Amino acid sequence: MTAIIERRESANLWSRFCDWITSTENRLYIGWFGVLMIPTLLTATSVFIIAFIAAPPVDIDGIREPVSGSLLYGNNIISGAIIPTSAAIGLHFYPIWEAASVDEWLYNGGPYELIVLHFLLGVACYMGREWELSFRLGMRPWIAVAYSAPVAAATAVFLIYPIGQGSFSDGMPLGISGTFNFMIVFQAEHNILMHPFHMLGVAGVFGGSLFSAMHGSLVTSSLIRETTENQSANAGYKFGQEEETYNIVAAHGYFGRLIFQYASFNNSRSLHFFLAAWPVAGIWFTALGISTMAFNLNGFNFNQSVVDSQGRVINTWADIINRANLGMEVMHERNAHNFPLDLAAVESISIGG
């Protein structure tokens, strides 16, 4: 009898726990994805803060030349970063217990791998949690689909690119100047500016900013006034009201006359789908571009592609970009390579008689 009562209480406790986890009445929804999201993001955030403040220099290139990234080792907010895991580790899974000591783990950049892997798991679970909450509220799933774009972008630079290049040391550093360094080296080695998927990403991000500004300003300029001239127009709005808060017909008429009629949406659903889909598709393409360049399927190479009738090269902007790429490649990891990879791959020219 005692065993049966204990079993019932245990089952009842588990049932109450499940109800609490999946309840949409909580101030912050947890969900089953949240059970994994909360510890992984807390771990990533905690280690990031500690390492950004106090981590010792990391031997990123595996050549016994540590690079300082933390505040206590001479950096400021702009120059500081979590330095990627050493090239000596490559793609090996490198938890603390795999190192001979904590000092060795820090020297080889163990915190970077810990932060990145927990962060990627956490943001993927955040996306799943968005879907889970939408499902429980009877909403459609497109919020999670939109969030998949930044998740794909983060996965591309922190996981896919290191896998393609063979080492976590090629991942993006977790800091401002480190991000710029990553961008410059990426351009030097992969010519990303000449990759069509990057161009689509630029169109997505800048276009999304433009459309967001246009939409916000049009809506704000066509609010239906429910107040006097002496009161704020915002005071006429009640949260959850059934009436429209702005006049879409007026906004459509304004924009249609500003450009032309069919440049303006007259359907609010189509408009908001477009506002979501444009930047999301652009960022998807950029993430796909990074993932293909990870395996060295690089941007277009139009170097010395224009020649005159005598076969002499007529330089184009593509040739100027190529010269800049070579210069950037010469500068980066200056002590790790005896010669830039692109130049080292060229056969030597015989100058003998």
UniProtKB/Swiss-Prot annotation:
The keyword Magnesium applies. Tyr-161 forms a radical intermediate that is referred to as redox-active TyrZ, YZ or Y-Z. C-terminally processed by CTPA; processing is essential to allow assembly of the oxygen-evolving complex and thus photosynthetic growth. Residues 345-353 form a propeptide. One of its GO terms (cellular component) is chloroplast thylakoid membrane. The D1/D2 heterodimer binds P680, chlorophylls that are the primary electron donor of PSII, and subsequent electron acceptors. It shares a non-heme iron and each subunit binds pheophytin, quinone, additional chlorophylls, carotenoids and lipids. D1 provides most of the ligands for the Mn4-Ca-O5 cluster of the oxygen-evolving complex (OEC). There is also a Cl(-1) ion associated with D1 and D2, which is required for oxygen evolution. The PSII complex binds additional chlorophylls, carotenoids and specific lipids. The record marks Y161 as: Tyrosine radical intermediate. It is a multi-pass membrane protein. The keyword Amino-acid biosynthesis does not apply. Gene3D superfamilies: Photosystem II protein D1-like. A quinone binds at H215, S264, F265. Keywords: Acetylation, Calcium, Chlorophyll, Chloroplast, Chromophore, Electron transport, Herbicide resistance, Iron, Magnesium, Manganese, Membrane, Metal-binding, Oxidoreductase, Phosphoprotein, Photosynthesis, Photosystem II, Plastid, Thylakoid, Transmembrane, Transmembrane helix, Transport. The modification Phosphothreonine is found at T2. The modification N-acetylthreonine is found at T2. PROSITE patterns: REACTION_CENTER (PS00244). Its EC number is 1.10.3.9. Fe cation binds at H215, H272. GO terms for biological process: photosynthetic electron transport in photosystem II; response to herbicide. Photosystem II (PSII) is a light-driven water:plastoquinone oxidoreductase that uses light energy to abstract electrons from H(2)O, generating O(2) and a proton gradient subsequently used for ATP formation. It consists of a core antenna complex that captures photons, and an electron transfer chain that converts photonic excitation into a charge separation. The D1/D2 (PsbA/PsbD) reaction center heterodimer binds P680, the primary electron donor of PSII as well as several subsequent electron acceptors. PSII is composed of 1 copy each of membrane proteins PsbA, PsbB, PsbC, PsbD, PsbE, PsbF, PsbH, PsbI, PsbJ, PsbK, PsbL, PsbM, PsbT, PsbX, PsbY, PsbZ, Psb30/Ycf12, at least 3 peripheral proteins of the oxygen-evolving complex and a large number of cofactors. It forms dimeric complexes. 2 of the reaction center chlorophylls (ChlD1 and ChlD2) are entirely coordinated by water. Herbicides such as atrazine, BNT, diuron or ioxynil bind in the Q(B) binding site and block subsequent electron transfer. This is Photosystem II protein D1. It comes from Pinus contorta (Shore pine). The lineage of its organism: Eukaryota, Viridiplantae, Streptophyta, Embryophyta, Tracheophyta.
